[in-house]
């Protein structure tokens, strides 16, 4: 299946709308586009114990891995937040994205006004902490 901008927007918007963000009121949705034509959505899920909150990007990626998908299966990650400026992933999400996605995959940021920015995963976090530092 080919995903044009409007299709991606509608799918990530559904994830965004499902956000459980009763504390911050800051909704985020994520959409993974897979090479086989399927997609996976994720949303942020907050908790009264704020450290237990899970971001939309990690929700989508962890679910993809739970289903058996891996780096080579993921073409693009689309991230939507309700802000005037585009919202980049937090540091924890960037680290997970660098670990679980190919560095030449695409990240697309979008807001509700349909402003977008696309980049490669490698552009997101130069000098990230990877397995080469663990001597494994």
Predicted segments — roles?
Residues 44-59:
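Compact, glycine-rich, soluble single-domain proteins
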Residues 27-34:
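Short beta-strand scaffold segments in enzyme catalytic cores
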Residues 2-21, 39, 72-136:
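C-terminal binding/interaction regions
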Residues 65-71:
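Phosphate/pyrophosphate-binding loops at sites that engage ATP/ADP/AMP, CoA/4′-phosphopantetheine
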Residues 14, 56-64:
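Short, well-ordered amphipathic alpha-helical segments that serve as non-catalytic structural scaffolds
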Residues 23-25:
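Short solvent-exposed loop/turn micro-motifs enriched in small/polar/acidic residues
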Residues 36-39, 47:
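Short, charged/polar surface micro-motifs in flexible loops or helix N-caps
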